[in-house]
Amino acid sequence: MAKYEKLIPRFLEYITTETRSDENATTIPSTQTQVVFLHKLMDDLKEIGLSDVKYNEKNGYVTALLPSNIDKKVPTMGFLSHVDTADFNAKGVNPQTIENYDGESIIKLDEAGQFVLDPKEFPNMKNYKGQTLITTDGSTLLGSDDKSGVAEIITAMDYFIQHPEIKHGDIKIGLGPDEEIGTGADHFDAEDFATDFAYTMDGGPIGQLEYETFNAAAMKVDIQGKNVHPSEAKDIMINALQVAVDFQDAFPRDEVPEKTDGRQGFYHLLSLDGTVDEAHMAYIIRDFDRDGLETRKAFAAKVAEDMNAKYGEGRVKATIKDQYYNMAEVLKDHMDVVDLAKDAMEAIDIKPLIEPVRGGTDGSKISFMGIPTPNIFAGAENMHGRYEFVSVQTMEKAVDTMIKMNELNVERN
C-alpha cells in the first residue's frame, strides 16, 4: 500500500480538469476554469480539516491554515503552488501509467506511435528505472506543472492531520492562478498570508532546490507600415513585416534560449504577426544580473531607435516592462530558509540539486514582498507539452520533504 494513498488519485483527478491561463485576459484569474477549480480545492481543503479556508476575490488565491499542535512558538511556514497550466492543449487529459519502468524502453504515448518518449531524445528518462511514471496520451500536456505541487501540498496537510504525533507549527498554504502567464503573484497578499517564509512546490526532478531566478522584462513592439499598391510602391511603401524582420535581425543571433544555458541571458521572440500595413512582436528579455537586464533593455530600446532613424520617426514603438527580479537578492540574506529545505532533503536521503532557475516562479515576486520563497521539486519533467511526465515516487518524496522540513523547523526553534 502506498504511504500516501490519496496522493495519486488526487493528482489524476486534478489534471483532468482544464485550467489553462490566458495572457490576453484582463480578469483575475484569467480564466473561469481556474475559478471553478479553485473553489473545488476549497472544498477539498475543508474536507481534510484545514482552518480559515478562503478565496480572495482580488487575487484568485485560495489560502488555508493548519494550526500548530505544539506549545511553543516557531516560525510560520508556507507552501504555495499554482493551478493553471501552460499554453498547450489541456482538454481531455488522458493519463497513462507505466509501472516499474525499465529506464531504457521507448514509451508509446498515442496508439499510432506518432509521439513517443524515447530515452535517446529524453535522457532524463534513464533516471526513473524501477519507478512508476505517469504520462500523457500524446494529445495534451499532463498538467504536472503544477498540479503535482497542488496534490502534494494537500496530501502533506492531510497527513499531518491524520498523524497528530508529528509536531509542527502553524502552516499556511496558498493555491493560486496565472503563474504560467507571469501575473499570478502580482496581487498576492503577503500581509494576509503572514508567514515567516514559504516554498513554492513548483520544481522539476527530485532534489531540485532553487533560490536564484532570472531578472525578467517583457517587450511589445508595434510597427506602423505604409501600404500602397505594389505597382506604385517604389520609394513609398514601408512593409511593416520587413521592418519586423530587420528589427529581429538586429539582435545577437546566439543570445536566444536555444543557444544559451547556465547563467547566460537571452532575448526571445515569442510572437510576430501582421501585414504590410502593421506588425506586432512580443519578446521576453532575461538575465541573471540586474545590471545585465538593464543593459539588454537599453540595447532593445536602441534597436527601436535605429529602426525609426532608418524608416522614419514613430514607425516603431517598443514598450518594455519589468516582470520580476532575481529572488537571490532577497534569499542571500535568508539562507537559513534554503538550508532548511536542503537539510530536510539530505535527512531523507535526497541529494539536493541547487541550481539557478532559467525562468521565474511565483516566489520571484513573493520574496520581494517580504516572504523569502525558494522553489522545491514537485516532479514534473518535460513541462508544457505532450512529452510531460512525472514519477509517482518523486511526488511521494516531495511530500516526505515537506513533512521533514516542518519537523526540523520545530527542532531548531
Swiss-Prot record:
Residues at which Zn(2+) 2 binds: D145, E180, H384
Broad EC category: hydrolase
GO molecular function annotation: metallopeptidase activity; tripeptide aminopeptidase activity; zinc ion binding
Entry GO terms, CC: cytosol
Active site residues of this protein: D84, E179 (proton acceptor)
Major localisation: cytoplasm
UniProt keyword annotations, A-Z: Aminopeptidase, Cytoplasm, Hydrolase, Metal-binding, Metalloprotease, Protease, Zinc
Reactions the enzyme catalyzes: Release of the N-terminal residue from a tripeptide
Cofactor: binding comment: Binds 2 Zn(2+) ions per subunit.
Transmembrane segments: none
Signal sequence, start to end: none
EC number annotated for this UniProt entry: 3.4.11.4
Subcellular compartments: Cytoplasm
Source superkingdom: Bacteria
Positions that bind Zn(2+) 1: H82, D145, D202
Matching Pfam families: M20_dimer, Peptidase_M20
A GO biological-process term: peptide catabolic process
Cofactor(s) needed: Zn(2+)
HAMAP family in UniProt: Aminopeptidase_M20 (MF_00550)
Assigned protein family: Belongs to the peptidase M20B family.
Its job: Cleaves the N-terminal amino acid of tripeptides.
Protein name: Peptidase T
Originating organism: Latilactobacillus sakei subsp. sakei (strain 23K)
Lineage: Bacteria, Bacillati, Bacillota, Bacilli, Lactobacillales
